[in-house]
Amino acid sequence: MRLSVRRVLLAAGCALVLVLAVQLGQQVLECRAVLAGLRSPRGAMRPEQEELVMVGTNHVEYRYGKAMPLIFVGGVPRSGTTLMRAMLDAHPEVRCGEETRIIPRVLAMRQAWSKSGREKLRLDEAGVTDEVLDAAMQAFILEVIAKHGEPARVLCNKDPFTLKSSVYLSRLFPNSKFLLMVRDGRASVHSMITRKVTIAGFDLSSYRDCLTKWNKAIEVMYAQCMEVGKEKCLPVYYEQLVLHPRRSLKLILDFLGIAWSDAVLHHEDLIGKPGGVSLSKIERSTDQVIKPVNLEALSKWTGHIPGDVVRDMAQIAPMLAQLGYDPYANPPNYGNPDPFVINNTQRVLKGDYKTPANLKGYFQVNQNSTSSHLGSS
C-alpha cells in the first residue's frame, strides 16, 4: 500500500514538473518576442508586406500582396466601364466582379485628409502619419478586392471614380495597371440622364450642367493617367472597343501582360456561370451587358441635346476635342464596325439572347424596343 502511495506521489510530482516546464518555456518564448520587438526600430512590423492567402474552388492556393499586378478599370460613369470589366471577367485567369462602391469613397476621404492642413497636423500629432495611413489603405483596398469575389490569378477592380486617384494607387500598388475608359461625353451624359443614373454633383435635369461636370471629371482622370505614364495607364476608347472588339482587346491584354483568350469576345455567354461573369442585380448597366457587343448605343444621343448646348459644346466640354472628338459633329464618324459586331447587332435585334436565370425579375429586357435601346455602356 505504501508503495502505491509513493508511486502516486511520484507520478503527481512528475506531472507538476512537466506543467511548470511547459509554462516556463512559453514565458521564455514570450520574453524573447517582447525583447525582439524592443530591439526592432519603430514600424518594424509591416502588415503591408503580408500576403492574403485564398483557396479557389479548384483547390488552387492564391497569394495576394502589394506587389501583385492589380488592374484598375475606371472612367466617368456610363463610359463602358461595366462592359470592359465584363470582357475581362470572361477571361479564365481574371476576376473583376461588381463595383465595391466603398473603395472610391475611402480614397476620397484619404485625399481630403491630405488636403486639410489642420486635419493632417492633428493626425500627425496623434502618430497617424502618412506611412500609417498608406499601409492601412493598402491593406484595406487589397482585402476588399480579394475577398469580394472568387479568387483568380489576376484580380481587377472596377469602380469608375477610382481613376481619379491613379497616381496614389500606383504608389500603393507599384505593379498595378490602369484602364481609363474614354467615351464621347455627349453619349455618356445622354445615357446618365435618360437612365437616371444618380451621380453626386450632376444635375440630371440639365445637359449643360452634366457636360460641364463630365468635362471636369474626365480632365482629372486623364491628367492622372498621363502622370502615371503610358506603361501603366491605357486610355481605352469605348467606341473603338465596340466597333473593333478583337483588335482592341488584343491591345488591352498585351498591355496587361495577359495571354489571349477568345472568351473575352463572348462575355454574354459566361454571365452567371462559375468562373465567368458575375453581374450585380442593382447596377444600371446590368441589363445591357447581358447582350453581346452591339452598335446603336454609339450615337443614340444625337438629336436629344438642346440646341443652345450643341452650339456651346466646344466651350462647355473642351475635353471632347482634346480626346479626339469633334464637338461640332452630330454625330461624329466613329468608324466602320467589324462584321462580327454587325452580326451581334442583328442577334440583338432578333432578341437572340437570354436573361440569366439568376437575374430574372430584377429588371426587364423589353425585346420589343431593342431597336431603340441597344448597346452596352
From Swiss-Prot:
The positions flagged as glycosylation sites are: N343, N368
Where primarily located?
Golgi
Which body tissues produce this protein? Widely expressed.
Q: Which InterPro entries is this protein grouped with?
A: P-loop_NTPase, TPST-like
Q: Please tell me where 3'-phosphoadenylyl sulfate binds in this chain.
A: 78-82, 183, 191, 195, 238, 285-294, 300
What are the UniProt keywords, alphabetically? Disulfide bond, Glycoprotein, Golgi apparatus, Membrane, Signal-anchor, Transferase, Transmembrane, Transmembrane helix
Report the EC number(s), separated by commas if there are several. Answer: 2.8.2.20
Q: Where are the transmembrane segments?
A: 9-25
Keyword Cell membrane (UniProt): no
Q: Spell out the residue ranges making up region: Interaction with peptide substrate.
A: 101-105
Q: Which residue positions does UniProt flag as site: Transition state stabilizer? A: K158, S285
Set out the biological process GO terms recorded for this chain's protein: 3'-phosphoadenosine 5'-phosphosulfate metabolic process; fusion of sperm to egg plasma membrane involved in single fertilization; peptidyl-tyrosine sulfation; prevention of polyspermy
Per the record, what ranges lie on the membrane's Lumenal side?
A: 26-377
User: Which SUPFAM superfamilies does the entry link to?
Assistant: P-loop containing nucleoside triphosphate hydrolases
Question: What ranges are annotated Cytoplasmic (topological domains)?
Answer: 1-8
An additional note in the Swiss-Prot or TrEMBL entry is: Substrate peptides must be flexible in order to adopt an L-shaped conformation in the deep binding cleft.
- Described purpose of this protein according to its UniProt entry: Catalyzes the O-sulfation of tyrosine residues within acidic motifs of polypeptides, using 3'-phosphoadenylyl sulfate (PAPS) as cosubstrate.
- Assembly and binders: Homodimer. Can also form heterodimers with TPST1.
- Tell me the protein's name: Protein-tyrosine sulfotransferase 2
Q: Which gene encodes it?
A: TPST2
